[in-house]
Amino acid sequence: MPRTSGGHLGPDPGGLLSAPCGTVAGMSKAEGTFDIDRFDTQDPHDDRDGVKLARAHITKTFHGDLAGTSETDIITVHTENPAAYVGIERFDGTLRGRKGGFVLQHEAGGTDGVPWMTWKIVETSGTGDLAGIRGEGQIIIGADGGHSYTLDYEL
């Protein structure tokens, strides 16, 4: 994935801008933004035949319905285009005033030239007031490089 000078994913990280996601019936919707505080990449650990596999560690600060911090570990695959990644993120903070945490499973890539970035709450990973949380959503990277999120969830 391309990196900007700040070390984070740019406005179009290898063609990974996400597609719109609607609210799932019976679920609440959380929305907001997040800042990437650190984006530490490692050199590719597998680089052959035009395909590179690499790892990165990311720390974030969330604003909006989710307020708190997270740590994420991802494995990326770099090809001509689109790039892709999978990852695990642990969030700690509040969701609309409820204190706790949960783990998100990330997946991103492209299908027929249409990029997407999704995340899903790992079942039974909720803690504190967020125990029992379930849901899924998406990450959106704006044209200005800003990051926002949506999360359809139920408690």
Task: List the predicted regions and their residue ranges.
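Beta-strand-enriched cores of mature, soluble protein domains
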Residues: 20-155
